[in-house]
Amino acid sequence: MTKYVFVTGGVVSSLGKGIAAASLAAILESRGLQVTLLKLDPYINVDPGTMSPFQHGEVFVTEDGAETDLDLGHYERFISTKMRRVNNFTTGQIYESVLRKERRGDYLGKTVQVIPHITNEIQDFVARGADSAWQGNTDVAIVEIGGTVGDIESLPFLEAARQMSLRMGRNSAAFVHLTLVPYIASAGELKTKPTQHSVQKLREIGIYPNALLCRADRRIPDDERAKISMFSNVPLDAVISVWDVDSIYKIPAMLHQQGVDNIVCEALGLTPPPADLSMWDNLVDALEHPQHEVTIGMVGKYVDLTESYKSLSEALVHAGIHTRSKVKIEYIDSEDIEARGTEQLKHLDAILVPGGFGKRGTEGKIAAIRYARENGVPYLGICLGMQLAVIEFARHVAGLGGANSTEFDPSAPHPVVALITEWMDREGKVEKRDTNSDLGGTMRKGAQRCPIKPGTLAQSIYGDDVNERHRHRYEVNNVYVPRLEAAGLVISARTPTENLPEMMELPNHPWFVGVQFHPEFTSTPRDGHPLFSSYIRAALESKNRRDPQA
């Protein structure tokens, strides 16, 4: 039977529950256990697909096409299990499901209430998510409950977790609480009172944490840990100091050295083999001892909140690990390029334009792409970054003045990028869209395998085919492809059924690639990713061309 670890947070949000949960999962997996993770989000949105990146950060896309919380990206990067739609659910999905059942008459005329109907539905969703991995033979499911203890939105989830623990009995569930121990500079000391109150709030609900992960900007002294232990009624060895580090990939070792996995295994009645974190040690060693250094310019419009590009930033770090390179990422506001020009790009070793939506800042991105193309700077365009590369090429090389996307200019004289109106999803179902379709849940999403054109740069990177995840509404317009190809652009991959362009490249450029998919979602620190590794190697070569002494 699957055992559960519920991870909660207190005092403030954004403490790193997702990293903590993923790190614990990585340790347990290294001990031979079959582990999966779930994220429970207390907002009423059905999913984060239509939420602003400034509000929510990145939307992570799973293989089966679900738009999910960015923490699922951390989960996939830390353990081998692939996340699916059932690994992330929201209050909106829970209420939607309960209301459908009520309309069907499933509750036989009963008054539908938060307890038991909503809490029972949450428990069913949790069990379904746990059973989806390992052919239903999951040993441990780690369940991260979003929000902060004390918030009204999280109460049904916490109550459901309490009920699950009670119903399953002894050694079936454990609770790990992540909390903040702030340092007050004026007093020159760490303050434990917020943590004490947070645990008291959790105990009022009926949840007694097996371990406290105490976040601080420094190591927490033993006397402060003892104070937390006494007032929280948590054993001293289960009060864990979690301090700031320069890489999230150091967290598994930090937690293991303080025995968090032993505490959890004891609470669950498990006796797995010892942990083997040698892979994580090797990753950290590669991070701390690079042989090279490159500077990548990421040109976007959400650069004030880098969480919007979390998987992409991590993919570049992974490529650095596998090329023994320190990858410095400079986030450049595309509107700043529109105002000040491309002079600020001259020191970069490579340029990247990520995915995005909307017209704002697109001309700055196009200017950056033109700079990369004309100056032989390695360029990687992802999703919108590929579409804008095609627009730039159409305007300045193929002679299609005024070329644009119908997303930005519905009456463009040359709509080289246009709305996808019909395509086939993973199950073979034909999807149809138009400009009046709902925004939520209407994009082309999920993984798709596509053949690659022989003799291309894409083939040298991926091999004969590519299988990556998508999240977009617009595509390169096939009507214009012959004119673009005649001008020197190569479409190096297409979808097998609809013949939609998936990859483009410029053979006369040192390294210029655009991809309609999101390769960052499949990059992991263990394996890296062939596209990003090739990109970083091209950036190193670019740097050496500019400065042979570097």
Swiss-Prot record:
| Binding-site residues for L-glutamine, renumbered to this chain | 356, 384-387, 407, 473
- Listed binding positions for CTP are 13, 151-153, 191-196, 227
Matching Pfam families: CTP_synth_N, GATase
Among Gene3D superfamilies, the record links this protein to:
3.40.50.880, P-loop containing nucleotide triphosphate hydrolases
Quote the pathway field: Pyrimidine metabolism; CTP biosynthesis via de novo pathway; CTP from UDP: step 2/2
Q: Where does UTP bind?
A: 13, 191-196, 227
- Residues bound to ATP are 14-19, 71
**Residue ranges of domain Glutamine amidotransferase type-1 in the record:** 295-545
Give me the Gene Ontology terms describing cellular component: cytosol
Q: Which residues act catalytically here? A: 383 (nucleophile), 518, 520
Q: Which GO terms describe its biological process?
A: 'de novo' CTP biosynthetic process; pyrimidine nucleobase biosynthetic process
Q: Which family does it belong to?
A: Belongs to the CTP synthase family.
On subunit structure and binding partners, the annotation says: Homotetramer.
Checking HAMAP family in the record gives: PyrG
This chain belongs to which protein, by name?
A: CTP synthase
Q: By which gene is this protein encoded?
A: pyrG
